[in-house]
A protein has these predicted regions:
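Long, internal protein-protein interaction and assembly surfaces
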Residues: 34, 49, 87, 98-99, ...
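N-terminal leader regions that mediate targeting or early regulatory function
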Residues: 1-149
Length: 214
C-alpha cells in the first residue's frame, strides 16, 4: 500500500473527471441520438444523480488509500476493504461489460489522431479543445440530422474524456485515438468496466508518485 502524505497539499481547481459534464452533453442530444445511446447500453447516463464533483480532500484521501497492485481501497484499519474491479464498476455504473477490448487512449497527448480530430471538428491545429468547446459544437451539430454521426462522435469523446478515462489534462488529447472510426453501437460490445479500472490504476500510480497534482 502507498505511504500516505499530507492530503492538504494535493489540491487542484480543475476537474478532469466530471459526470456533470457528461450529463450536460447527454441533455443536448435529441431523442433520435438518445435512442442510439440507449441501444449502446449507455442510456442510463441521463439518470445519473451526481451533479457535482467529489470533495477534493476526500478524493485525495481515496487516491492515497488505493493499492495500485491489488486495486483494493483501504478505508480504515485494514478490515474495511473495497475491491475495485470490473464487476464492481459494472454494478456501480452499469457500463457495458462486453467481451471486446475497447480502444485505448494514446500514449501521447500530441499525435496524428488528435490533429485529424481537430481538422474534422473544424478547429485549428494549435487549438486546445476543452469540454466547453465540445458542448457548443454538440449543441449545433444535433440540429441537423446530416450531422448525427459527428454529433455522436463528439458525445463519445466527452464520454471518454470526462468519465471513462480522464487523463492528465482537462483538454482533449489522448482520447482522440479512441474515437477514430467511432460507432456508438459498438460500445455495447466493449468491456468499458475493465478500461475504467485500468485507467484508474494509472491515475493512482501517477497521483502517489507525484508531489503535485498531475
Amino acid at each position: 500500500s502507498a505511504v500516505v502524505h499530507d492530503e492538504n497539499e494535493r489540491f487542484n481547481t480543475v476537474a478532469r473527471c466530471s459526470l456533470k459534464e457528461l450529463t450536460l452533453c447527454f441533455g443536448l442530444l435529441e431523442e433520435r441520438h438518445k435512442l442510439l445511446v440507449r441501444e449502446a447500453g449507455l442510456g442510463h447516463i441521463g439518470d445519473f444523480k451526481i451533479r457535482t464533483n467529489i470533495n477534493r480532500r476526500l478524493m485525495s484521501f481515496l487516491m492515497y488509500h488505493i493499492d495500485p497492485v491489488t486495486m483494493n481501497l483501504d478505508l480504515g484499519d485494514g478490515t474495511k476493504i473495497i475491491q475495485i474491479n470490473a464487476d464492481a464498476i459494472h454494478k456501480l455504473f452499469a457500463l457495458p461489460f462486453g467481451e471486446n477490448s475497447p480502444p485505448r487512449p494514446s500514449d501521447s497527448i500530441h499525435d496524428d489522431a488528435l490533429m485529424r480530430l481537430k481538422a474534422e471538428l473544424g478547429y485549428a491545429r494549435n487549438k486546445q479543445i476543452e469540454t466547453k468547446d465540445l458542448r457548443r459544437l454538440l449543441a449545433n451539430l444535433v440540429k441537423d440530422p446530416a450531422n448525427d454521426a459527428l454529433a455522436l462522435k463528439v458525445f463519445g469523446l466527452v464520454l471518454y474524456n470526462k468519465f471513462i478515462c480522464p487523463g492528465y489534462t482537462t483538454r482533449v488529447s489522448r482520447e482522440a485515438a479512441m474515437v477514430e472510426d467511432f460507432d456508438i453501437l459498438k460500445l455495447k460490445d466493449f468491456n468499458l468496466c475493465q478500461l475504467v479500472v485500468d485507467e484508474l490504476r494509472k491515475a493512482v500510480l501517477n497521483w502517489q508518485a507525484s508531489k503535485s497534482d498531475w
